[in-house]
Amino acid sequence: EDILIQKGLRVGSYTSPHLVDYNERICINKLPIDDSRLIDSFKLIESVREGILLTYFEYSTLAAFITFNQVDCDAWLIEVGLGGRLDATNIITPSISLITNVALDHQEWLGTSLEEIAKEKAGIISAKIPSIFGDPSLPKNIEQTALEKESDLHVLSRDFFISSNCDSSEWQGKYAVIDSIMIPSHWGPGEYHNLALSLASIEIVDSELLPSSKELNCLLNNFSVSGRFEIIEKKQTWILDVAHNPHAAENLRKRLESLDPYKKITAILSLMQDKDIIGFVKVLDDLVAHWIVCEMDTPRSHSVQTLQKKLIDYGISNVTAESGLLEAFSNVKNHTKKNDRILITGSFEIVGPAKKWLNSE
């Protein structure tokens, strides 16, 4: 997104869920659309749906497509909501299909094994349209789907590469090379791989849009994504991250370890009922001095009692239960010292309220 905007394109991005405001889901050049445009899109959908029942996500997907068409976006960046094969976003024919990785998540919908989940994600691969997989470990179902659909599949560390030495990194595509890349010190493997994936997708669609080393480093120097290892400096250092499964926790751990100087962390945690509590917590536990568990304002949230019991049964003794999110945020603020590190993680539904609360403090 940043690269395309830097090159002068008008870029529409559709992502989900939102953190604070619904409009965040539909952005033009990284700015959420205003209420009037969003309402006009919904009115248009209502005028033509003729009694067809639409889900919450289908409404927002159609609103995004209408908006991007009306404002004549040069590039559409569309994030799948869940899986891929049956997702509402999968009604368009893309210029390229990107799959970042496959991890155990949303098993009640996508399947209980990595290969089952891979099959659902492979559903976004379109016939005779190039596709990319951003992990060196290629699932058989993704490879097979690409073959069946005659999609030219590009795989990280097979068809494009990113490598680093002490001073900088280098990306190598099919024809192009970008060297002297200054990767942010707090990035984890996920961000590193996603950069390689983004550059490869641009080369495949239009190589003239690839940035120079100088242009890329300028972007990376100021790069941030709301709610993804977002650091907010107040009296304490607050770190907001929407990681919610063990795979994402591994990446979060790498990023926490990169912070200097090393400090133990106070972690405020909440997770949805379909998430693996212990699988998530055990990845981070030795970095955390004190766990605060709380319940989110959604019926899908684990109860605070369940979270506390799971952590204690696992062998974690320093666990405090808070009845609500705002109480947790306020109490941690009042009982930690200047420059202490506070991590808020486990879901969009805890990070969003935390961001809103911190902005009001």
Model-derived regions, located:
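Hydrophobic alpha-helical packing residues
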Residues: 2-9, 68, 284, 311
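Acidic-glycine-rich active-site phosphate/pyrophosphate-binding loop
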Residues: 34-38, 162-180
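Nucleotide phosphate-binding/pyrophosphate-handling subdomain across enzymes
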Residues: 70-80, 87-98, 102-106, 116, ...
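Conserved catalytic-core segment of NTP-binding enzymes
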Residues: 84-86, 92-151, 277
